From Swiss-Prot:
Cell wall biogenesis/degradation among keywords: yes
Binding, substrate: D10, S11, Y42, G43, N75, T76, T191, H192
UniProt pathway annotation: Cell wall biogenesis; peptidoglycan biosynthesis
Organism: Oenococcus oeni (strain ATCC BAA-331 / PSU-1)
Name of the molecule in the record: Glutamate racemase
PROSITE patterns for the chain: ASP_GLU_RACEMASE_1, ASP_GLU_RACEMASE_2
Family under the similarity heading: Belongs to the aspartate/glutamate racemases family.
Keyword Metal-binding: no
Active site residues according to the UniProt entry: C74, C190
GO molecular function: glutamate racemase activity
InterPro entries the UniProt entry points to: Asp/Glu/hydantoin_racemase (IPR015942), Asp/Glu_race (IPR001920), Asp/Glu_racemase_AS_1 (IPR018187), Asp/Glu_racemase_AS_2 (IPR033134), Glu_race (IPR004391)
EC class: isomerase
Length: 281
């Protein structure tokens, strides 16, 4: 058994979609989350910057909380920095893209999968490579939608304007045919996008499977915990009093969203500051 917590990192609020899934599947595991809102979006940034920022978040959680595993709850960071994280850290590091690809494969019935994500994730072809590795017969189409990240971070999810932007961005694209068939599966290749899932589902055909990789990523995390005999001691059930949620951005807005999204009012939320050496409280 291992009573240390699990770390989660993202460029902003999106990683909380993965945390919410973790609270369902791994209810006894402590959560330490960093959302780097001050430097989001990561999508248009150079790879070297994404790697630097991602390593800074990981370094903070390891040194501050001695985490036993790191869940990269960010597709862009997974696409651009996963090998560097695994080389740097001596703990398991779980990325989201392999999970999303597997979930997409499991969902499709006609082998036509569409993926939406940030500019960086799409250009990296990380999803394409993972999907093709799983099934070379797939038809795969990708679209970069950085505006969806801004919708979430600007608190426009669920608003009429937000619904309009989502519909206009994906409806016609999802209706297009390739090899005579429309895609029956849409993978949400950015952890911000599940916050817009209702709007996305409303913009596509009712038979399209809208896939959130979070569930599969946490399943993979749980499997690693099982193999390493690293679950929290079940005799001392964790009620999350020690959980901490950090942001480098606006703590008021971050606090409001985090409490609402996780449906928890009594959370420890702290602000992180950025300096030349990395992140500090």
């Amino acid at each position: 058994m291992d009573n240390r917590g699990i770390g989660y990192i993202d460029s902003g609020l999106g990683g909380l979609t993965v945390v919410r899934e973790a609270l369902k599947q791994l209810p006894n595991e402590s959560v330490y989350f960093v959302g780097d809102e001050a430097r989001m979006p990561y999508g248009p940034r150079p790879t070297v910057e994404i790697q630097k920022f991602t390593l800074q978040m990981a370094d903070f959680l390891v040194k501050k909380h001695n985490i036993k595993a790191l869940v990269v709850a960010c597709n862009t960071a997974t696409a651009q920095a996963l090998p560097q994280l695994r080389a740097y850290l001596e703990i398991p590091v779980i990325g989201v893209i392999s999970a999303g690809a597997l979930a997409g494969i499991n969902a499709t019935r006609n082998l036509h999968v569409n993926v939406i994500g940030t500019q960086s994730t799409v250009e990296s072809k990380a999803y394409y490579d993972q999907l093709i590795a799983l099934n070379s017969d797939l038809v795969i189409e990708q679209k970069a939608l950085p505006e969806f990240v801004q919708l979430v971070e600007s608190d426009m999810a669920g608003t009429p304007k937000g619904k309009q932007i989502v519909y206009q961005a994906i409806h016609n694209w999802m209706e297009e045919k390739n090899d005579g068939k429309k895609s029956d599966t849409l993978v949400l290749g950015c952890t911000h996008f599940p916050i817009l899932k209702k709007e996305i589902q409303a913009a596509v055909d009712k038979n399209v499977a809208v896939v959130d990789p979070a569930s599969e990523e946490i399943l993979q995390t749980a499997e690693i915990m099982r193999k390493n005999n690293a679950f929290h001691d079940s005799k001392n059930i964790n009620h999350h009093e020690k959980d901490v949620f950090y942001t480098t951005g606006n703590i008021g807005r971050f606090s409001k969203f985090t409490r609402e999204w996780l449906n928890k009012s009594n959370l420890t939320i702290k602000e992180l500051h950025i300096d030349q050496k990395g992140l500090k409280e």
